[in-house]
UniProtKB/Swiss-Prot annotation:
Name of the protein this chain belongs to: Bowman-Birk type proteinase inhibitor
Any Pfam family hit: Bowman-Birk_leg
UniProt function note: Inhibitor of trypsin and of chymotrypsin.
Organism (species): Glycine max (Soybean)
Site (Reactive bond for trypsin): K55, S56
Highest rank taxon of the organism: Eukaryota
Alphabetically ordered keywords of this record: Disulfide bond, Protease inhibitor, Serine protease inhibitor, Signal
Disulfide bridge positions per record: C47-C101, C48-C63, C51-C97, C53-C61, C71-C78, C75-C90, C80-C88
Signal sequence coordinates: 1-19
Transmembrane segments: none
Similarity comment: Belongs to the Bowman-Birk serine protease inhibitor family.
Keyword Cell inner membrane among record annotations: no
Site feature: Reactive bond for chymotrypsin: L82, S83
């Protein structure tokens, strides 16, 4: 039992001194700051299907799309639930909405 406690303490000490930009919040969420993507596939392109903006000038917009395992490539502050697969959303506030990820019904008909 003592060995287990010592191992856990060492794990926290080593984990706390690394320079990774990850934080565990009180809500069981993993916060990634300035995360980097190793691939530039379709899912990492900045886009948003569920964007809401305030009526202020300039507007303050936030995307509420949920993505698996990471946020889009332009996201500066990504929060991921500690689940498998991780469900992530970007908490950045911008003054615009990104292009939609999915084509609208009108686009499909043309």
């Amino acid at each position: 039992m003592v060995v287990l406690k010592v191992c856990l303490v060492l794990l926290f000490l080593v984990g706390g001194t690394t320079s990774a930009n990850l934080r565990l919040s009180k809500l069981g969420l993993l916060m990634k700051s300035d995360h980097q993507h190793s691939n530039d596939d379709e899912s990492s392109k900045p886009c948003c299907d569920q964007c809401a903006c305030t009526k202020s000038n300039p507007p303050q917009c936030r995307c509420s799309d949920m993505r698996l395992n990471s946020c889009h490539s332009a996201c500066k502050s990504c929060i991921c639930a500690l689940s498998y697969p991780a469900q992530c959303f970007c908490v950045d506030i911008t003054d615009f909405c990104y292009e939609p990820c999915k084509p609208s019904e009108d686009d499909k008909e043309n």
